[in-house]
Amino acid sequence: MPLDRSGYWQLIGKSIQGVQELYLKCEKDLSLELASSGIKLRVFTDPPDINLICFIVNKDGNSSLSRMNELNKAICDELKFDPAEITKRPEFMISITEFTYDQYGLEGFDGKNSMDEHLQVLGISSREFGSVGRVSVLRCTIINPWCALSRGGKPDYVEVFATTLKATIERVVSNLSL
């Protein structure tokens, strides 16, 4: 790969390709697998246009945004890097952010805000967003431009990440009483 502008764009392109493949795996396969266990996975941005995927997890039947936020924080706690626990190094890492009502709750011309559709799919009302004031959103970044090239290989990082994420989500959901 050239060490000039053309090489830089190849790195960016491969990173975005990797995140789009991860998006498809999560949106098409993982969300269906989790649904059979009564777990909802909502992936944002169809398809991703940068090297970032944001997603939210909820348990079927849970209509409390506060409880859903707790669930997503617990999932992040399992897959985050903690420098205080140097011996606990997750194979993959995710992070968490908050979408606040002040930023994402403003109504558009159609009377809806940018989170309405996502929350509806997850079983959470828009009123909950207004009263709680924030939604905890999980995210992961593909920083390896060769992730897409590992597809079908050993290891296939997209498959391994999806398997790790699924096991973590199922374990956390089973340990929390929602």
Can you name each region flagged by the protein language model?
Residues M1-S177:
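Conserved C-terminal alpha-helix-loop-beta "cap" of PLP-dependent enzymes
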